[in-house]
């Protein structure tokens, strides 16, 4: 009767497997319930009235001008948007609705400086200086935050979740900021002369960059086949700018507007149920679910090309860094153990253009030896 000893473990494993399937199957329902509660609590931002399949809501939009413009839009289940433009909005449309440079915050978070075993540890102060120099060159604000100080706010969850409380704290520190640009620590700004406002945020520039009626990719296990960006998207409706690769959206580099809608999206993204589910791609998977499942989020997320804000170390012309691009992100370098190799490859390019002054003094000698070894 040896087979009897295997029955109990088999039953336990079966229960675990069935529970996992149930958890995934019911996640959408539970999130929808939480979303509805959240929307009800935030009626000052999205004042929704439900009539059959149509949602009508009034939404305050934050602009660089010191006013709040109220614009009424109609969003159906197919996310068709028909805006009603107010007289004030008509008047402001003749202006140039882009933020002043001083109202941009470049944000970076890391704990590589505290961890000698991190592959970025020998370079992290130079990476910080790379960001600070760029921000100062264009009159932007720059904030570096220590990831270790944010671990209590995320508990035992993966480190990428810390970027949400970091962004919220920066918004509290700079209440007049228009946009926050989050850029992961495994990245370098390559073109110091390319102004983020001119490159992305000016109304006419963003209008030309938005990928309208473009398919969203997903490697997250989310059924997104046939799901596309809005056909008609006004830059003034965009409160979150991000790019995607073959795995779907990549949150290594994105911009979020400091507006009621932007902060609402941060709160929504920080939903505990997302953290409990916690898929392979962590916070990116949660953001993908938000975009795919909720028309309000879908409307306010602007998809742009990867190379415009998040170029990779890749030979693919759609994703790979080319001379003149704003930045390069070493996506996946911790997994493939290529962080040091990537930094040295692109650090050498920067040095050939800018000289050696971009190194942090405390790391200069080591980096010079790595980039330009003596025989």
Curated annotation (Swiss-Prot):
EC number of this enzyme:
2.4.1.-
Q: Which residues cross the membrane?
A: 3-23
Q: What is this protein called?
A: Uncharacterized alpha-1,2-galactosyltransferase C1289.13c
Q: Which InterPro entries match?
A: Glyco_trans_34, Nucleotide-diphossugar_trans
Q: Which segments does the topology annotation call Cytoplasmic?
A: 1-2
* Family according to the record: Belongs to the glycosyltransferase 34 family.
Among the GO biological process terms of this entry, one is: protein N-linked glycosylation
| PANTHER family in the cross-refs | ALPHA-1,2-GALACTOSYLTRANSFERASE, ALPHA-1,6-MANNOSYLTRANSFERASE MNN11-RELATED
- Identify one Pfam family in the record: Glyco_transf_34
The UniProt keywords, alphabetically, are: Endoplasmic reticulum, Glycosyltransferase, Golgi apparatus, Membrane, Signal-anchor, Transferase, Transmembrane, Transmembrane helix
Taxonomy, superkingdom: Eukaryota
What membrane topology does this protein have?
Single-pass type II membrane protein
Q: Looking at the UniProt record for this protein, which Gene Ontology cellular component terms does it annotate, in alphabetical order?
A: endoplasmic reticulum; endoplasmic reticulum membrane; Golgi apparatus; Golgi membrane
User: Where this protein primarily resides, as one coarse class?
Assistant: endoplasmic reticulum
Q: Where in the cell is it found?
A: Endoplasmic reticulum membrane; Golgi apparatus membrane
Q: Name one GO molecular function term.
A: alpha-1,2-galactosyltransferase activity
Q: Which residues lie on this side of the membrane: Lumenal?
A: 24-375
């Amino acid at each position: 009767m040896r087979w009897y000893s295997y029955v109990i473990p088999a039953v336990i494993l079966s229960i675990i497997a069935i529970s996992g399937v149930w958890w995934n199957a019911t996640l959408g329902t539970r999130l929808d319930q939480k979303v509805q509660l959240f929307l009800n609590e935030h009626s000052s931002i999205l004042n929704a009235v439900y009539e059959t399949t149509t949602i009508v809501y009034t939404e305050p939009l934050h602009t660089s001008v010191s006013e709040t413009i109220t614009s009424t839009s109609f969003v159906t289940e197919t996310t068709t948007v028909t805006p009603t433009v107010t007289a004030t909005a008509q008047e402001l449309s003749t202006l140039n609705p882009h933020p002043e440079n001083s109202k941009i915050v470049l944000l970076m978070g890391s704990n590589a400086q505290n961890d000698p075993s991190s592959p970025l540890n020998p370079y992290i102060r130079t990476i910080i200086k790379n960001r600070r120099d760029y921000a100062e060159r264009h009159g932007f604000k720059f904030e570096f935050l220590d990831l270790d100080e944010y671990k209590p706010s995320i508990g035992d969850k993966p480190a990428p979740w810390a970027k949400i409380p970091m962004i919220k704290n920066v918004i509290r520190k700079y209440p007049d900021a228009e946009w926050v640009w989050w850029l992961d620590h495994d990245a370098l700004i390559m073109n110091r002369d390319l102004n983020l406002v001119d490159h992305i945020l000016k109304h006419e520039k963003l209008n030309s960059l938005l990928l309208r009626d473009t398919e969203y990719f997903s490697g997250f296990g989310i059924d997104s086949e046939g799901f596309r960006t809005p056909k008609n998207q006004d830059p003034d409706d965009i409160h979150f700018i991000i790019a995607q690769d073959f795995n779907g959206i990549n949150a290594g580099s994105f911009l979020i507007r400091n507006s009621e809608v932007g902060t609402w999206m941060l709160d929504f993204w920080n939903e505990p149920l997302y953290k409990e589910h916690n898929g392979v791609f962590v916070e990116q998977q949660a953001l993908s679910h938000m975009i795919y499942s909720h028309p309000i989020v879908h409307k306010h997320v602007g998809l742009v090309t990867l190379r415009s804000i998040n170029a990779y170390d890749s030979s693919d012309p759609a994703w790979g860094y080319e001379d003149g691009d704003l930045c390069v992100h070493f996506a996946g370098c911790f997994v493939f153990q290529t962080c040091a190799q990537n930094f040295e490859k692109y650090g050498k390019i920067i040095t050939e253009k800018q000289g050696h002054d971009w190194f942090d003094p405390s790391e200069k000698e080591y980096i010079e030896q790595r980039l330009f070894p003596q025989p």
